[in-house]
Amino acid sequence: MLIKQGDRLINTRNWSELVKPEQITRDSDPADAMYGKFVCEPLERGYGTTIGNALRRVLLSSLQGAAFVSVKVSGVQHEFTTIPGVLEDVTDIVLNLKQVRLAMDTDEPQFLELSVNKKGAVKAGDIKTNQHVMVLNPDLHIATLTEDLELTFEFEVRMGKGYVPADMHEGLSEEIGLIKLDSSFAPVRKVAYTVEQARVGQMTNYDKLIIEVWTDGSVTPEDAIAYSAKIIKDQISVFINFDERISGESSGNSSGSSDVNENLFKGIDELELSVRATNCLKSANITLVGELVQKSENEMLKTKNFGRKSLDEIKRVLCDMSLDFGMKVDGFEKKYQEWKRKQQNEA
């Protein structure tokens, strides 16, 4: 379908005729908040690797997480020293602290404390958290006290992304005794993907993307993938140099003096859709094709009981009429009323 925008023609077939995934399914325990295996199919040949690699890189590098950025230990001036009565030296303790995984529900820095006074193991679960911060691996070993003594740790927790070296944190105090920490904010620990063949009808030259995601528990695998997809979408949208909500005025399928595709004025009942799809549209108060095409695919998928199968069914019907979702139809109601009057006059 060719659509005129300004002084140029936009060929919507560049994207409208590509096969799109019918569904994304989870092939792992949905109750597991730290591991997810997902299958996305069908994809155009080569798109499995393209999408899988892009998602993997963003998952590992760009998602927000929480981590310690500094620590103060009572009686300690710097990290290259030892603490009497503690088995580990301060350097080893700092390395252990970097492994503590945190979840935080605020962008504001938080300050936590850990105080011990008895001989024994000190673990991450001993950290006194608040309503904004949660320790995700409380069994992580931090230090071992070989005798009874009072020892206090003071931490600053921040949100961030990726890996930030200690000297790159902004706004930290330079006071003696404050130890700046290298921080790994990334909530995704590991990502792996494979690409297999998928079948569409009798054709087997399509891709099936299988992606596995391991997180630290501060974000679910589903949300991690969703955030990454959103990041990619936002970053590449700048390359689109035309109005994505393509106008419903067609250069190739026009009729009448207004050059409007008259299929826009058809009622939903005229499309011979399945009962399920028709009922979903009616429940969303969509009665005309012109109202339908102005909705995006994502908007439609949020409609109650409206799934990918109904979406694909409607897309095929719209395509036969040289229409698609996400079209811009300026002044549709006015055009519809003019068309109705014209039909009445001709009758």
Curated annotation (Swiss-Prot):
Residues 1-243 are annotated as: Alpha N-terminal domain (alpha-NTD). One of its GO terms (cellular component) is cytoplasm. Its EC number is 2.7.7.6. InterPro entries: DNA-dir_RNA_pol_insert (IPR011262), DNA-dir_RNA_pol_RpoA/D/Rpb3 (IPR011263), DNA-dir_RpoA (IPR011773), RBP11-like (IPR036603), RNAP_asu_C (IPR011260), RNApol_insert_sf (IPR036643). It catalyses: RNA(n) + a ribonucleoside 5'-triphosphate = RNA(n+1) + diphosphate. SMART domains: RPOLD (SM00662). Keywords: DNA-directed RNA polymerase, Nucleotidyltransferase, Transcription, Transferase. Residues 260-347 are annotated as: Alpha C-terminal domain (alpha-CTD). It comes from the Bacteria. Pfam families: RNA_pol_A_bac, RNA_pol_A_CTD, RNA_pol_L. One of its GO terms (biological process) is DNA-templated transcription. GO terms for molecular function: DNA binding; DNA-directed RNA polymerase activity; protein dimerization activity. It is an enzyme of class 2 (transferase). Belongs to the RNA polymerase alpha chain family. The N-terminal domain is essential for RNAP assembly and basal transcription, whereas the C-terminal domain is involved in interaction with transcriptional regulators and with upstream promoter elements. Homodimer. The RNAP catalytic core consists of 2 alpha, 1 beta, 1 beta' and 1 omega subunit. When a sigma factor is associated with the core the holoenzyme is formed, which can initiate transcription. HAMAP family: RNApol_bact_RpoA. DNA-dependent RNA polymerase catalyzes the transcription of DNA into RNA using the four ribonucleoside triphosphates as substrates. This is DNA-directed RNA polymerase subunit alpha. It comes from Nitratidesulfovibrio vulgaris (strain DSM 19637 / Miyazaki F). The lineage of its organism: Bacteria, Pseudomonadati, Thermodesulfobacteriota, Desulfovibrionia, Desulfovibrionales. The gene is rpoA.
